[in-house]
């Protein structure tokens, strides 16, 4: 994503080109009205809109994660041919420029910024799945869907955050600082 933001008292100007998203120019934007979880709220002639200045980073995370669909789950592995859930996270984010170390789910949970409004590329954490406390994680894709290294039976698969099993074990959403 190419991005440049120039703000003045009134009006504010934005020029942004998103990956597969909408282009915004200074003529279309009246005011940058604030941010929420890294998204910019802008007021344009067409009404309120949201843009993500980090969309290219997020799309890289999701693109690499989706390329791993169907790969096997192997406990303790962190790619590129097999993964456990935290190894999957490590592989995808590390290969997208995030400075993180290989850790367990319980180790990642205290490192992330806790959020309530997940965006694609954020993390989904589950607890008490096979051990007490934070024990499973995946990458949020949007619309309640996430991708994760599920089990030896499933490998890397898509899942639904709102399934009864995941809701029973849901811990929260998180976001890595880059």
Segments from the language model and where they lie:
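Beta-loop motif signature
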Residues: 1-41
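Aromatic- and glycine-rich peptidoglycan recognition patches
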Residues: 6, 15, 19, 56, ...
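SH3/SH3-like beta-barrel fold
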Residues: 40-44, 146
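Disulfide-bonded cysteine-rich modules in secreted/extracellular proteins
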Residues: 1, 58-72
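Loop/turn positions that initiate beta-strands
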Residues: 27, 121-122
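Catalytic cysteine-centered active-site loop
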Residues: 68-120, 170
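Boundary regions of SH3-family modules and the immediately adjacent low-complexity/disordered segments
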Residues: 43-63
